[in-house]
Amino acid sequence: MKKIIMTGGGTAGHVTPNLALVPELKKLGYEIKYIGSIEGIERKIIEKEGIEYFPISSGKLRRYFDLKNFSDPFKVLKGVFQAKKIIKREKPDIVFSKGGFVTVPVVIAAHLNKIPVIAHESDITPGLANKLATPYCTRVCVTFPESVKHIKGDKAVLTGTPIRRELLEGNKLEGIKLCGFKDNKPILLIIGGSLGSKIINEIVRKNLDNILSKFNIIHICGKSNLDENLENRKGYAQFEYVNEELPDLMKASDLVISRAGANVIYELLALKKPNLLIPLSKKSSRGDQILNAASFEKSGYSLVLKEEELEDKNLMKKLNYLYENRNVYINNMSKSKMDNGVKNITELIKKYTK
């Protein structure tokens, strides 16, 4: 039996793509172990899946001045020795790294143990952890065609991003039942990210009458963002957060408004959902969502509305255009070869564990 050690953490976005690979890797006969941080979000998620978890020390990597920048390198160094010991004991055939600060010591340790490493980068430009880890990687899987030039050493492989299988197995009727919709209006799903989006919530509710004249609305608005005054509004179903229900709600929707994080837009691509992307502005991000959205717009998969241009008339104009041209977007997405990241990545893993 082949053995793989996976690593990635710091945020859910560095863990869920790993989970998407797990069922296929198990089917292929791989024994799976996981190295993560001591107190990171990844520990709870991974242990819930019944995967053996090895915690190591790791310092956070920062691009800005902080007093912890003087102590954290020693935590990373400690993590390298801990990971090296784990890898030497477990003897994996390969290491798969999804990024996040905890992966740097693991990748270095694998390199020191002469174990091949495949990393994955979700965004167009690599994050700091993957930048530091790339010299020690055998290959780096990238999500966007534009990413290839940003990976040094001719190591980039265009694979797309892995999508959880259960997300593709939703039930449309269950989604409609959950929302209580009784008519046949097209359904608009609005996703503001795991924490919701204040600006998107406000513009949607401000234009609720106009939008409801044409669509039923599923609004995932984020924690503490429910509006009690809209609880019984016909055609409007609001949720703070969804988990198991998401596949059914996705399946039920005809159009989607979303932020432009790499994971969610590739989920929309896999599901062939016409979408309007409203990327985070540079005021509140490093600009990666703007680049992600531009790439999908260029490929004909998405329509984009800049946050700075998020006004009443622009929103309705874009929604109407998207719905009228929905089949064009569906056809474009159907031609993509980047909607099967799980297969593309597991094939690469197989190649380096023969």
Curated annotation (Swiss-Prot):
The keyword Kinase does not apply. Keywords: Cell cycle, Cell division, Cell membrane, Cell shape, Cell wall biogenesis/degradation, Glycosyltransferase, Membrane, Peptidoglycan synthesis, Transferase. One of its GO terms (cellular component) is plasma membrane. It is an enzyme of class 2 (transferase). CDD domains: GT28_MurG. Coiled coil: none annotated. GO terms for biological process: carbohydrate metabolic process; cell division; cell wall organization; lipid glycosylation; peptidoglycan biosynthetic process; regulation of cell shape. Pfam families: Glyco_tran_28_C, Glyco_transf_28. Pathway: Cell wall biogenesis; peptidoglycan biosynthesis. Belongs to the glycosyltransferase 28 family. MurG subfamily. This is UDP-N-acetylglucosamine--N-acetylmuramyl-(pentapeptide) pyrophosphoryl-undecaprenol N-acetylglucosamine transferase. It comes from Clostridium botulinum (strain Kyoto / Type A2).
